[in-house]
C-alpha cells in the first residue's frame, strides 16, 4: 500500500461483529435498549473475564464489507474499543475473534479507547467505518474521514457511497 493512501479502519462491534444481537440474546430481550441500567450492568458483569468476544457471530455484512474495503484500498485494519472494566481480557478475545473469523486478515488490529488518534497519520486522512456517532464525530474532529454504518440498520450502499465520495474529494 502506498504511504499516501488512507488506511481504512473497520470497527468490530456493530459493523463486523453482531455484538448487540448476541448481547440481547444473552439478556433474553429483543433489543438491549429494553433493559434498565441495573439489568444492563448485570449482563455486562457476566461478560467480564469471559471469552464472550471470541465467540460472537459475524454480522451478515461482515465478509462483504471486508471485500468492499479491500477492493477500495487494497487492505484494511481493525480499530475497536475494549470493554470498560475488562480491557486486557476483552482485547485478547477480540484479537482471537479477528484471527478466527476474518480472511484475508487485517494489516493491523488495534484495540484502544480513543480511536481518534489514528484519524491522521503521516498527514494522510484515514477512514473509519463505525456504528457509533460519537466515534465518528471525534474522528472527523481529529481530521479523519468517518462513515457511520450500523450492520443491523444500514445497507452496504452507505459504505459504497462514502468510499466513492472520499475518492472524488481526493481526486
Residue ranges and their predicted role:
Residues 1-50, 141:
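Active-site neighborhood of HAD-like aspartate-dependent phosphohydrolases
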Residues 7, 109-139:
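Conserved Lys-Pro-Asp/Glu-containing loop-to-beta segment of HAD-superfamily phosphomonoesterases
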Residues 11, 79-81, 129:
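Short hydrophobic segments within beta-strands
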Residues 17-20, 25, 76, 85-89, ...:
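Short catalytic/ligand-binding loop motif for oxyanion handling, primarily in non-cytosolic enzymes
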Residues 53-58, 62-92, 98:
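Substrate-recognition element of Asp-dependent hydrolases with the DxDx(T/V) motif
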Residues 80-84, 109-117, 151:
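Acidic carboxylate-rich catalytic motifs and surrounding loops in phosphoryl-/glycosyl-chemistry enzymes
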Residues 94-110, 165-170:
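Structural recognition of alpha->loop->beta junctions
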Residues 126-165:
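Acidic, Mg2+-coordinating phosphoryl-transfer loop and its flanking beta/alpha structural elements
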Amino acid at each position: 500500500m502506498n504511504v499516501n493512501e488512507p488506511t481504512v479502519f473497520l470497527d468490530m462491534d456493530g459493523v463486523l461483529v453482531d455484538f448487540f444481537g448476541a448481547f440481547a440474546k444473552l439478556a433474553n430481550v429483543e433489543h438491549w435498549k429494553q433493559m434498565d441500567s441495573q439489568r444492563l450492568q448485570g449482563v455486562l458483569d457476566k461478560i467480564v473475564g469471559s471469552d464472550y468476544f471470541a465467540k460472537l457471530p459475524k454480522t451478515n455484512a461482515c465478509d462483504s464489507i471486508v471485500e468492499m474495503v479491500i477492493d477500495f484500498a487494497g487492505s484494511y485494519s481493525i480499530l475497536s474499543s475494549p470493554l470498560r472494566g475488562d480491557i486486557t481480557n476483552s482485547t485478547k478475545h477480540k484479537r482471537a475473534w479477528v484471527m478466527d473469523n476474518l480472511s484475508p486478515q487485517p494489516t493491523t488490529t488495534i484495540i484502544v479507547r480513543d480511536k481518534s488518534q489514528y484519524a491522521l497519520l503521516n498527514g494522510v486522512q484515514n477512514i473509519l467505518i463505525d456504528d457509533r456517532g460519537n466515534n465518528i464525530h471525534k474522528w472527523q474532529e481529529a481530521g479523519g474521514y468517518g462513515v457511520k454504518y450500523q450492520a443491523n440498520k444500514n445497507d452496504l450502499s452507505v459504505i459504497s457511497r462514502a468510499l466513492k465520495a472520499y475518492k472524488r474529494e481526493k481526486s
